[in-house]
């Protein structure tokens, strides 16, 4: 790991945090309910700013001006959301679609094969290919934003994926050159430490940017190397993807807007459940919840990376993850509903 880069990122983050708190600007209390449900502290949403300022260290595509401009447009959109300049979830969604479409169109980073016969037939059409790619990236970006509600959850998850990709690189497996993960990991580690101690959040700006970069990298990797199963890519991104898709379906089921945040995501239910068991400060419970989730995902990805080219194994891992997620969710939401019903009768 690049120790120098780690300390530089850490120092810059501390300086920015001091400035933001001094100016009472860009703090977590300006965020949505999914950002502050476990904490009422004035924590700077500076993670995305750090990732953007340090991007020249880990992004390898700066020669493509339009690509870089559009990529950082997603950060700026998240930034405007964080400071409540764009409060409409629908408007943010429309702008996300336009930005992602531009990136996909100008970079030619497209999903062309899934090993699902019917879907691959439609993907032979270029227009459908673009629409499907935009949809998938959109799901990941917003899924990353959802899971960022718990300390270390998204940053830790991205570190795990980064380590898995470095492992493939060390084994000589051909992957995308879009991101230098050997430089990104120390930056993420610096953010992880501050996030662990509740001193920094990614905010919408950071979660949007990470979701976009990891999506583009993994799609590009599969374009470059067909020996990597497309289901391995899904395995790496299953958690934010399924979190978002599951959230959309459950909100529609209960006649709620899919684009509005709430506190019924799995990580939030786990937090509330742990809170009932342990009478600790919310800060400790928040971080502990993120560690539990990341430990599970670490085991899942360690297994998946050993069989990166075996589609059958990847499908089994995905099915197990989704089944386990659903069972845990149903159990915890049932307890929450039951408790609400009991309280309403009093």
PLM features per residue range, with description:
Residues 195-196, 221, 246, 304-310:
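Transmembrane helix-loop junctions in multi-pass membrane proteins
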Residues 226-231, 248, 260-261, 312-315:
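Extended hydrophobic-aromatic, low-complexity segments
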């Amino acid at each position: 790991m690049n120790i120098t880069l780690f300390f530089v990122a850490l120092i810059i983050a501390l300086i920015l945090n001091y400035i933001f708190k001094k100016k009472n600007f860009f703090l977590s209390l300006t965020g949505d309910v999914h950002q502050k449900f476990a904490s009422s502290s004035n924590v700077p949403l500076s993670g995305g700013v750090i990732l953007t300022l340090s991007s020249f260290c880990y992004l390898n595509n700066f020669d493509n001006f339009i690509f870089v401009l559009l990529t950082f447009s997603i950060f700026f959109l998240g930034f405007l959301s964080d400071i409540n300049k764009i409060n409409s979830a629908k408007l943010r969604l429309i702008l996300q679609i336009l930005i992602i479409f531009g990136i996909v169109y100008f970079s030619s980073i497209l999903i062309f094969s899934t090993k699902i016969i019917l879907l691959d037939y439609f993907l032979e059409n270029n227009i459908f290919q673009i629409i499907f790619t935009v949809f998938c990236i959109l799901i990941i970006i917003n899924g990353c934003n959802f899971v960022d509600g718990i300390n270390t959850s998204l940053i830790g998850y991205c570190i795990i994926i980064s380590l898995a990709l470095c492992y493939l690189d060390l084994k000589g497996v051909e992957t995308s050159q879009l991101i230098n993960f050997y430089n990104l990991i120390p930056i993420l580690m610096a953010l992880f430490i501050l996030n662990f101690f509740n001193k920094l959040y990614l905010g919408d700006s950071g979660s949007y940017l990470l979701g976009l970069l990891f999506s583009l990298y993994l799609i590009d990797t599969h374009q470059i190397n067909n020996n990597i199963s497309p289901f391995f890519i899904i395995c790496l991104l299953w958690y934010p993807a399924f979190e978002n898709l599951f959230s959309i379906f459950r909100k529609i089921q209960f006649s709620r807007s899919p684009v509005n945040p709430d506190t019924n995501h799995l990580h939030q239910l786990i937090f509330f459940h742990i809170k009932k068991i342990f009478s600790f400060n919310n800060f400790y419970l928040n971080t502990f919840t993120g560690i539990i989730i990341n430990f599970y995902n670490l085991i899942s990805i360690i297994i998946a990376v050993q069989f990166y080219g075996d589609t059958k194994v990847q499908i089994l891992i995905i099915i197990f993850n989704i089944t386990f997620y659903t069972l845990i969710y149903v159990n915890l939401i049932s307890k929450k509903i039951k408790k609400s019903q009991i309280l309403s009768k009093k």
